[in-house]
């Protein structure tokens, strides 16, 4: 009996001790602030306050993320001049792959590489963890006041009329 209790306690501790994410960010709450220093730029979320932000967590090794990127680019171009900024945060651990991807695909977005660790259960990175994000792609729409308005888990077709209209209404 004593051995069974010990095994049960170790199992419970083991499962709760392995959790590496934070509490997921909720709609209607302030977006957690962060600063990422990439090789050629530093981006702080709060410095973008006053704009509508589409915050996208992605990586070059993530096929759905790569598939989603063209629609993010198209949406950014369509909404240009309307106070909407796409901030793409890469959790790539390999800087060379990241920079090669940006160059090869002519990515013209505000994008920074935080780096991260790919695991069997998702991805670990400090900024993604602030949002409770462990699976990518994951995106947030943040209003001009820094409040999370929408959250998307998985790839999104950012050209959808519903999304474009939603972003237009936030202006």
Language model segments and positions:
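Structural microenvironment flanking redox-active thiols in thiol-disulfide oxidoreductases
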Residues: 67-107, 118-129
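Short pre-active-site segment immediately N-terminal to redox-active cysteine/selenocysteine motifs
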Residues: 51-53, 57-61, 135
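Residue-level signal for well-ordered, solvent-exposed loop/turn and beta-edge residues enriched
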Residues: 29, 41-42, 147
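A short beta-strand-turn-helix
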Residues: 33-53, 76
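Short, acidic, Ser/Thr-enriched surface-loop or helix-capping motifs
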Residues: 25, 37-38, 142-143
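N-terminal targeting signals for export/organelle localization
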Residues: 1-35, 151, 161-165, 170-171
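Thiol/disulfide oxidoreductase modules built on the thioredoxin-like
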Residues: 105-107, 114-166
């Amino acid at each position: 009996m004593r051995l069974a209790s010990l095994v049960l306690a170790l199992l419970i501790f083991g499962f709760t001790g392995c959790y590496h994410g934070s509490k997921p960010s909720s709609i209607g709450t302030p977006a957690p602030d962060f600063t990422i220093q990439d090789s050629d730029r530093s981006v702080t979320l709060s410095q973008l306050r006053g704009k509508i932000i589409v915050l996208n967590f992605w990586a070059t090794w993530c096929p759905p993320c790569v598939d989603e990127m063209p629609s993010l680019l198209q949406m950014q171009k369509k909404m240009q001049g309307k106070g909407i900024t796409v901030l793409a945060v890469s959790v790539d651990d390999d800087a060379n792959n990241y920079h090669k991807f940006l160059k090869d695909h002519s990515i013209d977005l505000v994008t920074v590489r935080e780096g991260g660790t790919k695991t069997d259960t998702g991805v670990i990175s400090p900024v993604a963890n602030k949002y409770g994000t462990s699976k990518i792609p994951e995106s947030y729409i943040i209003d001009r006041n820094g409040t999370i308005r929408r959250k998307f888990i998985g790839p999104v077709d950012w050209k959808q009329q519903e999304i474009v209209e939603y972003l237009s209404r936030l202006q």
